[in-house]
């Protein structure tokens, strides 16, 4: 089974439910709302999902990775459906997939660009940990030594690569201290 084929997912479309960043700036007087798709795996799966900064420590199906508030009603200016994936940006998010027993560990260093991708990647590996260095205040080097990933991925908006590191604030994306 290929976990990443479209037919493996139930797709729910929220019609005219979303304004992106540019749409919010232009307002509904100038742009039309967009459709937004919410995908759920059709295959058996069970995930242990943890976001320490939000007090989330849950076991369940893929739906636990979605923030129900963001999908509860239309609010073009106060809600952002992309924040519905993975409860938006958090310093650390951990996944343990109980259906995959391969002993593999992936560490993802990310910005908000990866929020939509990460839950789906968690379906194909036993352990996945996500760090957003813009919010993470610990030592990434120490964290990596303790987590011992098999691979480290950096998933970020291309504009993140252009920004200089602010060594004073400890909030720059590439501040890997």
Named regions from a protein language model:
Residues 1-177:
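Extracellular glycan-modifying ectodomains
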């Amino acid at each position: 089974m290929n976990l990443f084929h479209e037919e493996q997912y139930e797709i729910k479309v929220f019609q005219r439910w979303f304004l992106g960043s540019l749409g919010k700036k232009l307002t509904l007087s100038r742009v039309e709302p967009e459709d937004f798709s919410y995908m759920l795996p059709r295959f058996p799966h069970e995930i242990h999902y943890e976001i320490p900064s939000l007090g989330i420590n849950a076991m369940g199906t893929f739906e636990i990775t979605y923030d129900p508030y963001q999908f509860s009603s239309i609010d073009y200016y106060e809600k952002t459906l992309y924040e519905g994936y993975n409860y938006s940006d958090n310093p650390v998010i951990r996944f343990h997939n109980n259906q995959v027993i391969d002993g593999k560990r992936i560490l993802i260093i990310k910005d908000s660009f990866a929020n939509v991708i990460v839950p789906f990647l968690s379906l194909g590996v036993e352990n996945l940990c996500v760090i957003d260095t813009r919010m993470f205040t610990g030592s990434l080097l120490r964290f990596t030594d303790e987590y011992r990933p098999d691979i480290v991925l950096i998933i970020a908006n291309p504009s993140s690569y252009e920004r200089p590191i602010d060594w004073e604030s400890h909030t720059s994306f590439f501040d890997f201290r």
